[in-house]
Amino acid sequence: TPIIVVSSNSEQKHRIDILKQSVEYYIKKPVNTQYLYFTIKNLSRLININRRISPLTGLPGNVQIHAELKKKIANKEDFSVLYLDLDNFKAYNDVYGFLKGDEIIKFTADTIMKCVHSYIPTNAFIGHIGGDDFVAIVPTLNCDEICENIIANFDAQVTKFFTEDDVEKGYIEVANRKGVIEQFPLTSISIGVVEADKGRFANILEIGEVGAQVKHMAKS
C-alpha cells in the first residue's frame, strides 16, 4: 500500500526527512482532491506493475507472460516459445549458496536478453517464470541460431561463477541425503522450443502442455 503524507510544513528539510521514512509521496497543503485522487491511482498502478516483475531479474512474470501468449494467439501470429532452464542448478546452490545462485540467475537473464535481442531487436518478449525457469516469445518459427547462441554464450561465461578447481575438474561434488558424495557437471542451460504456427494452438494451456514435453526432451 502506498504511503502519502499530506502536510502544511513547507520546509525542504521536513519534506526530505519525510521521504526518507519509506514514504512514496509528499503533498503540501492545501490539497486539491482531484490531484490527490490521481496521485493515489497512479501510485497504485505502478505498485501493481512492480508486483508482476521479478525483483531479481527485472523481467516480467507469469501474468505478463500469459497475456503475451494470449495476444499472439488472438492475433493469429506465427511465433515460437523458448522454454529455458538450468541444469544442475540445485547442486550449485548446495555448494556455493543461494547468493551466488542469484548471481547465476541474473547472469542467465542478461544472457538470454542479449542473445535474443541480437537476432530480434524488437517485438521479442522475455519473461522470468520463477527460480531458474525463463521464457522467450519470438516472432519466428526458426530459432536454431538463437538457441545455439544462448547456449554458446552461457557456456563460455558461466565458469566465472565456479572456482578454478571445479572448472578444471568439470564437475562439483555434493553430499546427498545419505551422506554419499555425488558428482554433478557444471551448470548448463537447456532450451525447449514450441513452434506456434498460425492457428496451431487455441489457448495457452495447449502451449503449456507441449512446452512441458519439449522441456523434458531438452533435459534428457
Give the positions of each predicted feature.
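C-terminal output helix
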Residues: 13, 31-40
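Amphipathic HAMP/coiled-coil signal-transducing linker helices
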Residues: 15, 43-62, 85
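Alpha4 helix (beta4-alpha4-beta5 surface) of REC/receiver domains from two-component response regulators
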Residues: 9-25
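Conserved long alpha-helical elements within nucleotide-processing catalytic cores of c-di-GMP signaling
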Residues: 61-80, 90-114, 127-131, 135, ...
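A short glycine-enriched loop-to-beta-strand structural element that forms part of the catalytic core
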Residues: 128, 162-213
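Receiver (REC) domain switch/output surface
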Residues: 36-47, 68, 72
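Conserved helix-loop-beta segment at the catalytic/binding core of cyclic-nucleotide signaling proteins
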Residues: 110-146, 152, 156-164, 169-170
